[in-house]
Amino acid sequence: MSEQELLDIFDARANMEAMLVSLAIARGGDEWEADVLAKAHLLSKLEACDASEKMLDEWDLRHQAFHTAIVAGCGSYYLLQMRERLFDLAARYRFIWLRRTVLSV
C-alpha cells in the first residue's frame, strides 16, 4: 500500500466517522447514549493502567468498541458496513501507531 493510499483511507475514515457521529447524535436515543458512556468508562479504566504489550490487544478492543458505540446510533446498516471496511483497511497501520503512542508511555 502506498503512502497516498494510506492517507486516502484515513481521510475517508475520518470523514465517514464525522458524518456517522452527526447522524448518531440526531438519531440516537437514551440507550445509545448510555452505551457510549459505558464504553467510554471501560476504555478509561484501561487507560489508567500501565501500558504494556499484553495490554495492547485489550486497549484496541475497548477503543474499537467505544468508536463503534459512538456511531451505532446513526441508524444506517450500510453506512456502518462501509465504516467497518475502512476501519479494517486501516487496522495494520493502527497497530503500528498504537505501539508508537500507547506503548511508548
State where each predicted segment sits.
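Conserved amphipathic alpha-helical segments that form helical-bundle/coiled-coil interaction surfaces
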Residues: 13, 30-96
